[in-house]
Regions:
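Catalytic phosphate/metal-binding cores of nucleic-acid and nucleotide-processing enzymes, i.e., regions
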Residues: 2-165
């Protein structure tokens, strides 16, 4: 088990959080990242000191190591560029499988929590997925594809991350 110093984590989905159905920005013909949503994410990070860990399908070709960034696809590159534009960066991503077993989104989060020292975490996602089955709904701030991340979500996320501080 890899344990580092205790940290706060934002498990971040992208679609329906950092973009909406009406987002004009595009990435390879698909909906890209809405720059108007980035200040909301930045506020959460600034007020909690949390790190961003991807749970989104946007993580598929995202690379943590600088020397592997050339392997990234357009989605991962856009994510890095947009986050960097407001002083943010992705810290890590959840695993899709371990020991040959594929994970659900919830299981990927539980695996991450098992291998890292996390003091508090929040999940920003527009879908429920299997979070209730893994007893993670108390940490879920559920957005929607119409509005994405809003000030109300920001307030709730900060409360969850700073609980007990």
């Amino acid at each position: 088990m890899i344990k580092t110093n205790s940290m706060k984590i934002i498990f971040l989905d992208v679609d329906g959080v950092l973009n909406t159905k009406s987002t004009k920005a595009r990435c390879n013909g698909y909906i890209g990242i809405d720059e108007n949503k980035l200040p909301f994410l930045k506020e959460i990070v600034d007020k909690t000191g949390a790190e961003i860990v991807l749970v989104s399908t946007w993580k598929e070709h995202w690379e943590k190591l600088l020397e592997r960034k050339y392997l990234q696809d357009a989605f991962a590159n856009q994510l890095d560029e947009k986050l960097n534009s407001v002083g943010l960066k992705v810290f890590d991503k959840t695993e899709d499988k371990r020991d040959g077993v594929w994970y659900s989104r919830c299981e990927g989060i539980l695996d991450y929590l098992a291998y890292h020292k996390v003091s508090s975490f929040v999940i920003l996602d527009d879908f429920q997925f299997d979070y209730d089955g893994c007893d993670l709904t108390d940490n879920l701030v559920q957005t929607n594809e119409k509005d994405g991340l809003t000030p109300e979500h920001v307030k709730k996320a900060i409360e969850i991350l700073n609980l007990g501080n």
